[in-house]
Amino acid sequence: MSTDSNTMFLKIEFGGGLELLFSNQRSHRITIPSTVPADNNTSVTTKDAASPATRPADVTYLLHHLRDHLLKEREELFMENGTVRPGILVLINDTDWELEGEGEYLLKDGDEIVLISTLHGG
Amino acid sequence: MSCENPSVDKDALMARRPKFDKTKQCVKCKERTGNVVIRHAVYCKSCFFPLISTRFRKSLEPSVNPTPDGPRRKALKASGSLLVGLSGGLGSTVMLDLVAKTYFGAPSVADLGEEAPPSKPKGGKEHPRNMTGKDSEIWRGVPAVCYVEVCGAFPGAEDRTERVRQVVESYATTSPPFAFDFIPLRLEDAFDLEWWKGVGELLFTPPPSSTPILALQAYLSSLPTQTAIHSATQTLVRLLLLYTAASRRASHVLLGTSLTSLSVNLISGIAQGAGFSVAEEAMEEWRGEGKSGELTPPIRIVRPLRDVGMKECAIWAWWCGLRIVGRERYLGGTQGIGSLTRNFITGLERDYPATVSTIARTCAKLTPKEGSDGVCLLCQRPAQHGVQEWKSRTSIRSYNHASFSSSGHERPPHLANATDRPQHRTEPSPSSHLTPHLCYACHTTLTSRSSRGNVKQTSDSKVVPLPLWVGASLSLVPTSEDSSGEVWATRRMGDGEMKAAIGDLLLNDS
Ligand SMILES: [Zn+2]
Ligand SMILES: [Zn+2]
């Protein structure tokens, strides 16, 4: 899908009300770099000479990217201590991210990532 | 140990277990690769649906028949109709879906698994009880879905009634279609004579010139803390559902309390003095007074998702494509007991998923040492004898008390300007009171002081309206003592034992 081997294409879905923090849009298609700064800084590109430490893009980086570029409000309802807030589930290609290494899962071009809030209660 | 948020330093206290045991293979079919981890166990998508619906049925079906089955399991046959409480939140939306699919012929969950083609008919042989008609063989009549809109209590909150209606009506468009009766209520109905006339008996003179919404707001704003407003709101919702259920001759009211929410309710309930009725939070039976004054047949309040966590609910909703309307979380602010407990339990569930079910199971075993000797007039749960004396022994009720004056203790700063509520007003019989007819939790809800100061004191009126079911037990008549007509005294029907002022209890503190 991606024509540029330096980037990858991802499908992002929000559910359970989490979309309210993301312009109330449930489905997003985004492109992120394949190699990212080790400190999860999403405002620089790895081509910058100033950030030599890099690693392959993983879910933790994606969460920072979503927070920095797609999140519209109330960051504290999305992330906490460098990961998603308790009560937010992540599915990677329809599978619980707990089976896939959580934040350490290395993203592949075309992956579908679903983030669902359980905080709307019952 | 300090009182800091325990989730912060938890790793220092308890080693984190791996999220799943051994392999990524499904523990059920032992074939497919797993898709979800539930309390350390791995399940594939095909095994997930029967797992959840089995837990749902195991929690519900043993309480369907009026008397427990003997050694041989009889067919399920309820003594009345079914009422499903729907809040618009995740748990109750999933519960409604399970009810529709399990008992009323909505397309089966098995059809949603990857293995089963969508056209496959429901497993009729395996589930002979399942019906595809207008009502099931289990409950009488058409089942109702009841929604209580709470926006009247929270200025600026969205009215979600129509969106919830769409959720309920979506089951009328499935194949085969099934139409629930949708009953939209509002929190202020608890103060609305028109609603009460439909479900209860009018034995008293209603307060003049107050709309239900103003009465609701006056009631809530009289409460001492945000936490109290939260629990009072929950109590109103619960009794609106129960009286509605009684008016439909329901034998069962289903609530979508998940394992996660149950644990939150249990812990925050205990924190707010509701320890006596902890067992009721898991399973309870209620009898109201019917329109002609006699007790209605018992209604069972069942929480069929009490063994299903929020995570499983969210995954069910996602895989089934359910739309979650969302609900107002009236938790009493971010520092309210409800919010703090929910944050704690949610964090606990992520990091130590088995502990949350341990909380629920442990609390379900709790039974009070002494039996109840009555029913609380406000929440209509079993009440414990002697709440008033007990409270007076264990808590500081007045800084004007002689022993404090003589000991030279000073008032804490936040009470420095407060005047104590007079212990007695000029009632006909000061010793009789609403207090003896309240449970400890409701008494606390109505009277506790907050260490952070009380919430807004908006109302000048001295006496506050109460939900109509309280007034139906005590007859309300205006007194002539106050020419403004704002003071209400209460007089019990019959022997006058409860000649008392509700107003004394509900007076603003300062
Ligand atoms: Zn399986
Ligand atoms: Zn009570």
Swiss-Prot record, chain A:
GO BP field: protein urmylation; tRNA thio-modification; tRNA wobble uridine modification
Record Pfam families: Urm1 (PF09138)
Keywords assigned: Cytoplasm, Isopeptide bond, tRNA processing, Ubl conjugation pathway
Residues recorded with modification 1-thioglycine: G122
GO cellular component assignments: cytosol
Subcellular location: Cytoplasm
Cross-link Glycyl lysine isopeptide (Gly-Lys) (interchain with K-? in acceptor proteins), sequence positions: G122
Region feature Disordered, mapped onto this chain: 33-52
Superkingdom of this protein's organism: Eukaryota
Polar residues biased stretches: 33-48
Pathway the protein takes part in: tRNA modification; 5-methoxycarbonylmethyl-2-thiouridine-tRNA biosynthesis
CDD domains found in the cross-reference section: Ubl_Urm1 (cd01764)
Entry PTM: C-terminal thiocarboxylation occurs in 2 steps, it is first acyl-adenylated (-COAMP) via the hesA/moeB/thiF part of UBA4, then thiocarboxylated (-COSH) via the rhodanese domain of UBA4.
Primary subcellular site in the record, as a coarse category: cytoplasm
Entry's family note: Belongs to the URM1 family.
Functional note: Acts as a sulfur carrier required for 2-thiolation of mcm(5)S(2)U at tRNA wobble positions of cytosolic tRNA(Lys), tRNA(Glu) and tRNA(Gln). Serves as sulfur donor in tRNA 2-thiolation reaction by being thiocarboxylated (-COSH) at its C-terminus by the MOCS3 homolog UBA4. The sulfur is then transferred to tRNA to form 2-thiolation of mcm(5)S(2)U. Prior mcm(5) tRNA modification by the elongator complex is required for 2-thiolation. Also acts as a ubiquitin-like protein (UBL) that is covalently conjugated via an isopeptide bond to lysine residues of target proteins such as AHP1.
Identification of the protein by name: Ubiquitin-related modifier 1
Lineage summary: Eukaryota, Fungi, Dikarya, Basidiomycota, Agaricomycotina
